[in-house]
Amino acid sequence: MGLNDSLLDMQLLTIGINHHTAPVALRERVAFPLEQIKPALSTFKSVFLGHPAPNAPEAAILSTCNRTELYCATNDRAARDAAIRWMSDYHRIPADELAPHVYALPQSEAVRHAFRVASGLDSMVLGETQILGQMKNAVRTASEAGSLGTYLNQLFQRTFAVAKEVRGTTEIGAQSVSMAAAAVRLAQRIFEQVAQQRVLFIGAGEMIELCATHFAAQGPRELVVANRTAERGAKLAERFGGRAMPLADLPARMHEFDIIVSCTASTLPIIGLGAVERAVKARRHRPIFMVDLAVPRDIEPEVGKLKDVFLYTVDDLGAIVREGNASRQAAVAQAEAIIETRVQNFMQWLDARSIVPVIRHMHTQADALRRAEVERARKMLARGDDPDAVLDALSQALTNKLIHGPTSALNRANGADRDSLIDLMRGFYQHAPRSSDTSDR
């Protein structure tokens, strides 16, 4: 490894796709189930083994319904292309299919993006708070996987502090239309009275809990929760005065429900076209309103083509959510100003960190010179040389070697470069004569 390789600055980089750049059909293919994130981080780091950069990259993966993002810090200048290639290979998606939807954000752009995401400015639901918890979970997972280092740790700690500042000093989260509220609004377009409908929730996570809260407020005729873990499903149903049912009963009982909201962590659809066709037939073509908030999707997309079935995904709900975002543009401007200031602060810290390897290398080189000359002096003393002469030789050798680099650089430099070096050296050696003092007299 050469000197230049060892002194390359660490660079921040974010690679990802989100609801702005890719439809749900692609987002679900690049999503990482929680149990896959640690192994994925390990394979990502292995990509850089054998590269000229001296350090394995720091990395964290954020995977939600609306985004899959890889945050990394590396001194490998080929990291951008390598990261995109890795994501393509890992998910077995052709690079030419994935690349048009991928954003690659270096340095300050990566910092700004992280701050905006955590603050809810990049969310489908402007100002929503769920993303902050998801980002904290991503950081915790990266830490447990051993892929979080100084740079990303500092980035995320600053990110969480900025999110707290934005939410505490602006109205960014006020009057926001959540995905859950948007689902209720859509249901009201299909059914005049949600209170007369039977509602089924599939899953028992945070998103289903939010949806159940909003639908329960409408006083539905019946509220049922089906979950893979029966105990958790029963607990959630009890909270809202509903009842639980086994997930295995879903195909046989789907026809009983007018509204079905699903959001599970399943990697494959749990509601297929055939099951819904049978449910529609059993209902004698009374409409079914279905909301699929999962990524990857819980409901096969072909279901949406059935007559009397109204199927909506997270992207469909986004249109309703955006209607409520326009009224909070003043808060957005205020939040963006805060973020911009904090980005500059972080970049100052990053710039300061960039000189650490240089200083460390200077110390290492100087110490190597010192040890070599001390060893030479010891040998001179051992053979009986005069101590004063040995000390004089030691000091002369150290002086010559320590100033060899600067003087060689000055001798090689020309014109403006030489003037800049002279000014730089003057700062190093406070008693160096000014240029005018060195001219011929």
UniProtKB/Swiss-Prot annotation:
It comes from the Bacteria. It catalyses: (S)-4-amino-5-oxopentanoate + tRNA(Glu) + NADP(+) = L-glutamyl-tRNA(Glu) + NADPH + H(+). GO terms for molecular function: glutamyl-tRNA reductase activity; NADP binding. Substrate binds at residues 64-67, 123, 128-130, 134. Keywords: NADP, Oxidoreductase, Porphyrin biosynthesis. GO terms for biological process: protoporphyrinogen IX biosynthetic process from glutamate. The active site is at 65 (nucleophile). NADP(+) binds at residues 203-208. SUPFAM superfamilies: Glutamyl tRNA-reductase catalytic, N-terminal domain, Glutamyl tRNA-reductase dimerization domain, NAD(P)-binding Rossmann-fold domains. Its EC number is 1.2.1.70. During catalysis, the active site Cys acts as a nucleophile attacking the alpha-carbonyl group of tRNA-bound glutamate with the formation of a thioester intermediate between enzyme and glutamate, and the concomitant release of tRNA(Glu). The thioester intermediate is finally reduced by direct hydride transfer from NADPH, to form the product GSA. Possesses an unusual extended V-shaped dimeric structure with each monomer consisting of three distinct domains arranged along a curved 'spinal' alpha-helix. The N-terminal catalytic domain specifically recognizes the glutamate moiety of the substrate. The second domain is the NADPH-binding domain, and the third C-terminal domain is responsible for dimerization. Belongs to the glutamyl-tRNA reductase family. PANTHER family: GLUTAMYL-TRNA REDUCTASE. Catalyzes the NADPH-dependent reduction of glutamyl-tRNA(Glu) to glutamate 1-semialdehyde (GSA). This is Glutamyl-tRNA reductase. It comes from Burkholderia pseudomallei (strain K96243). The gene is hemA.
